[in-house]
């Protein structure tokens, strides 16, 4: 599946960020019997075989050298089979973006459309489109802004998101539960329940980062991505989505910060950002500064640290 002279093992050493080992198990949870993840159908497994093999090679490259940057990733993004897997992984009835393109209509000429998309990605002619702004009501009566990407942006973001996820899953800490493979809100609640009911808790702090998705620094986001990725084309692709802007009622707005909720790439970018800005700090603080044991449960931008009695 790789092109000639391309290798998933293309890595260069990077300076150690002096962090704890990742790929941690879930923190503070009771053991659960059975498989909590739904098993994909045989049809889905067959379609995803090539993509999964690629992701496994990337995972092994990361494991071989945890202090290195991967320099050969972008060619996986414009692989037609990977793009096809990304297309079939989308929601068929999802609302269209600014392009007005639907899943069904795009699929009428799927092979030709994906070949054209792959060609534009390969030669650098791919352009990210602005997201379409939509609002959904929140329980407190306020409105939550969502950004709906164009269909082709969804496809490419799906492929890129899987690549980023498989890289950083080897680093993410055990108390992070949001938007990660094999993890869900119920597991976060289970960890919280165990901590409160079975531990001697002194206090519980519930923290929500205000406007988190809208205020992510693009400059720092890129710096964090570059901790593990040395492929300039891959980094540039992510920057295109960050800078694509928002279209609302016919008015285009430049994106100076943030990553839109609704984009397929946004959850993994948010987790990467919080890993470097919160998780590593919280882990260091509770190990070096806190008096007594501290358990942390984080689901996306919601966090519940708990201090246990000594």
Task: Tell what function each PLM region has.
Residues 145-146, 150:
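Conserved phosphate-binding loops in nucleotide/dinucleotide-binding enzymes
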Residues 113, 120-135, 139-140, 163, ...:
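Conserved polymerase palm-domain catalytic core
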Residues 1-100, 104-111:
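Non-catalytic, polymerase-adjacent accessory regions of viral genome-replication enzymes
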Residues 151-159, 185, 203:
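Duplex nucleic acid-engaging cores and interfaces of nucleic-acid transaction enzymes
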Residues 86-90, 159, 237-242:
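Short alpha-helical scaffolding segments that buttress acidic/His motifs in well-ordered protein cores
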